Structure formats: C-alpha cells, structure tokens
C-alpha cells in the first residue's frame, strides 16, 4: 500500500494544538465529530492514517481528559443501527465505554439528549445506572434554534441537568450524527458560566478538511459519505471575510454559525473569540498529508465504494431517492463509473457466464477479490458454500501456492456441520457462510499442515478489495470487515425470497 499520510506527524501536531486551545480556559468542552475509534472512512481515504488515531491523541493526554457520551433518546427508541458494526446505538454506547476504558480514558457519564420519557430509553437508563454508569437527562431546548433569549435561560439550557466534571478537557462524543453533542456542550457552557467558571468550546471534526480545496476528491468523498444527511462542502464565507483566507466547511456549520455565535456571546456576556466556523475547529489532519496524489486516488476509490453502498441502501429502503440521486451526481461530477472499480467487471462477467447455463431465476452470485499484487480471484455461490466463502478459500490457496483442485476442508468435517445446520437447526439456507467455512478450516488445520499453512495467509487479505454481484447478508459483511476486506455489492438480492436469502 502506498502511504499518503504521516500518522506520527499528525499525532504530534493534533495533541499540541488541542493543548494550546485549552490553555485559554479553565476547562475546554471538545465536541468530537465523526468516529472516535474505528474511523474506517479516514483510514481508506488517507492511506497511512490509523483508524484509532483520534483516541490515541486523547490517550497522549489522558490525565487531562474525561469523556461524556451523548445519545439521542429517539435513536434508542427506534433501534437505530450503526451501519459499519451492525449494532444498535444503545449497544454502541456500551461498546464505546468498554473501548474508552481499554485506552485508560475516564468515562464521566452518558447523556440522554432530547429525552421525553420514551419507554425504551428509560429501560436503557436503568440498565446503565445498575451497572454503575452515571446518566444525565437533557430535554428538547425551548426556543431552539432562533429564540436566543429563551435558549440561554433557566427555561432553555437551565432546564438540563448539570454534568459534574473535574478535568480540563471534556470530550463530548456520540455513537453517530445528530446525537446532541453541540447542545450538550452549550448547555454545559451555560451552567459553568453561572458558576463563574471560565470555559471554552471547540470542535474536533476530521472532515471536511478545512485546508484542502473544496473540490478535492478527499472532501468530495466526505460528501459521498454523508449524502443521507445532505451535507454539502462550501467555502467558509465568514473565514474568508475576516481573514481573507480560503477555508472549507460544510453547510450545516455555516448555516448555524451566526446563531451559535450569538448563543456563546449571550452565555459568556462578551464577544466570541470565534469569527468563523473554521475558528471553532481544532482539526490538523490536513497537515499530515505527505502525498496528495495517493490521497486523490484513495478518495476516488472511496467515492465509488460509497456509490455502491448508497445504491444498496436505496434498494433496501434505508435512504430516499434524493440521496441516491445526489450520489449519482457526485459520480458524474468526477466522470466516474461503477466499473472503474477493478473488481466489478470480473465479478459481473463470471456471473453472466454462469447464467448462460443456469435456470432462468438463478442469480448466480459471484464475489471477486483483488489481492495486493493486482491478481483478481473469483468465487461462486453453490449448494455447499456461498460466494464469499468460496473466494476467500480461492484467495488463500493462491497465496499459499496450493493447487486449485486440492480440498482444504475434509468432508468428514463439512458433513456434520451441514447436517447440524439443515437437520438439527432446520435452517433453510443450506450454503455455508464465510465464517462457518473458516471455522471448519480451523478445525482441519489441527491435523492438516496444508490447511494450517493456508489459514496463515488470511492476514494477507487485509486491505484487499472485493465486489459481490448480489447484496451480502450482514454475517458475511461483518466477516469481510473483520478480515479487513473492503467489499461492495451490486444492488441485487441473491434470491426471490423476502426473508430466507
């Protein structure tokens, strides 16, 4: 993999800049946008970026940091899913707490935002409190967003519970967007100022990158990742007017800035130190870029991946037509085609070839996988195993120089697994999944050195690209994610079945 980003340089620059910002205050409330850990988007568009870079920045100064996690009550109520992990937001909060503790960071509390007594949220609050987690309840802010007098009063932010904090940097994070992080920070600013404390607010958001051109593929990839939120990159007009410098921000921050500035000035009783949304940020990711061409190429590849993701989400009814149309416009703007992704045509061509001799209704699912050296392998779905399992076996055989006709998994192992699945557990989906096949392979590896040698090649699949001619089920998606394979799918279901697919 060609590296375009210097992780070490970024870590030093980012830590230093946050500490400089906190020096102006007794306490800094730092709103963390995007993902605190496992930022796979940043890792893909910035080759060399550590997916856990942001939490490592905090770990550098852990003695000065405590974390508050926000979650919107409505997201818990409707079981909102974090797409990349396939878990609900309430479970993501628990995972986040465990991970933060793993990095030796203090988790202060969980804040339930816009709480209106929702039953499922109340159950979640009880669960947290009975595990010893402090929970605060914040309510819909009266007068928000335009009535500043009411917002900055005992009826507005004053109605929220004050979060007791002890460290100079309070990181406010969340499982996903629109969770109430900004509202929580401003509510705390209100309460802290009433107590006579000198506190500040800043925002740590990786994308868009403020010191990279607005039409750079890196920033366009951010638009592609947020088509459902209707985020649009724009020149920060406030920054340009004040400093005469070009800077990039997104529409929501620019639209909100005048009101936000008024709220901060009303809370503090003095003129804001921020003259633009860019001023509010502490993001230094742009200074870690060391090879612009590598970043451009990686970002373009990400945009095509996002096109397939949006197309599949539209097929599943998870996004509206507007989001899908915006995604197509982004592709057209950069003169990109889905087929520009190397693994797409090999998968489709093999599937079409299989269809020539198959039943009319057979979708002939195929998965293609590109290895680091550019070799593209394919795997087809069968009665024995699905396409994801087949292509992974073919890939590790190729990497281990094992003959294609040699069986890695003994029928003695496979038959009991298939019988368990079909007869004992009465599953209608007979084909073994990728994880089931890898489990069978690991059992064979105990007595078969060839299987063991092939298994050792699984680590080489990290960073590989794959494409499926049909939508993968969640289990196979997650297995590919754990293997580090970036997979896209054509927006077609593998069968006519609505549930058993």
UniProtKB/Swiss-Prot annotation:
Domain of life from the UniProt record: Bacteria
InterPro entries assigned to the protein according to its UniProt record, in alphabetical order: DUF1846, DUF1846_C, DUF1846_N
Designated name of the protein: UPF0371 protein CD630_08980
Transmembrane segments: none
Organism, as annotated: Clostridioides difficile (strain 630) (Peptoclostridium difficile)
Coiled-coil portions: none
Pfam families membership: DUF1846, DUF1846_C
Family note: Belongs to the UPF0371 family.
């Amino acid at each position: 993999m060609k590296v375009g980003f210097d992780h070490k340089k970024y870590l030093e620059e980012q830590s230093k800049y946050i500490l400089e910002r906190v020096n102006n205050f007794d306490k800094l409330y730092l709103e963390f946008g995007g993902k605190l850990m496992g930022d796979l988007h940043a890792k893909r568009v910035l080759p060399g970026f550590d997916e856990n870079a942001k939490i490592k920045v905090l770990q550098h100064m852990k003695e000065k940091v405590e974390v508050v996690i926000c979650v919107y009550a409505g997201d818990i109520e409707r079981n909102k899913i974090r797409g990349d992990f396939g878990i609900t937001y309430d479970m993501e909060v628990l995972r986040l707490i465990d991970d933060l503790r793993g990095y030796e960071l203090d988790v202060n509390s969980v804040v339930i935002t816009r709480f209106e007594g929702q039953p499922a949220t109340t159950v979640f609050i009880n669960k947290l409190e009975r595990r010893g987690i402090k929970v605060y309840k914040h309510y819909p802010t009266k007068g928000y967003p335009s009535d500043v007098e009411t917002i900055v009063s005992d009826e507005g932010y004053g109605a929220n519970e004050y979060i007791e904090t002890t460290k100079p940097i309070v990181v406010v994070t969340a499982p996903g967007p629109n969770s109430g992080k900004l509202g929580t920070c401003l509510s705390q600013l209100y309460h802290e100022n009433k107590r006579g404390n000198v506190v500040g607010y800043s925002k740590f958001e990786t994308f868009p990158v403020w010191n990279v051109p607005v039409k750079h593929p890196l920033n366009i990839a951010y638009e592609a990742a947020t088509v459902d939120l209707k985020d649009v990159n724009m020149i920060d007009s406030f920054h340009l007017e004040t400093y005469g410098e070009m800077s990039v921000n997104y529409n929501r921050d620019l639209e909100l800035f005048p009101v936000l500035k008024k709220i901060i000035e009303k809370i503090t009783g003095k003129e804001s130190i921020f003259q633009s949304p860019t001023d509010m940020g502490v993001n230094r990711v742009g200074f870690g870029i060391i090879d612009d061409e590598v970043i451009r190429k990686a970002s373009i590849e990400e945009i095509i991946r996002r096109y397939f993701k949006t197309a599949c989400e539209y097929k599943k009814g998870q996004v509206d037509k507007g989001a899908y149309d915006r995604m197509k416009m982004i592709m057209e703007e950069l003169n990109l085609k889905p087929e520009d992704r190397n693994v797409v045509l090999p998968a489709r061509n093999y599937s079409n070839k299989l269809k020539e001799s198959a039943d009319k209704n057979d979708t002939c699912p195929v998965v293609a996988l590109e290895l680091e050296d550019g070799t593209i392998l394919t795997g087809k779905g069968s009665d024995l195993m699905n396409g994801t399992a087949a292509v992974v076996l073919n890939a590790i055989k190729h990497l281990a120089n094992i003959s294609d006709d040699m069986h890695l998994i003994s029928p003695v192992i496979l038959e009991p697994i298939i019988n368990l699945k079909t007869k004992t557990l009465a599953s209608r989906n007979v084909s073994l999944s990728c994880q089931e096949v890898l489990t069978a392979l690991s059992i064979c590896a105990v007595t078969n050195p060839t299987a063991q040698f092939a298994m050792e090649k699984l680590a080489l699949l990290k960073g590989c690209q794959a494409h499926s001619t049909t939508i993968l089920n969640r289990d196979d998606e997650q297995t590919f994610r754990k293997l580090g394979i970036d997979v896209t799918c054509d927006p077609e279901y593998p069968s006519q079945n609505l549930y058993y697919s």
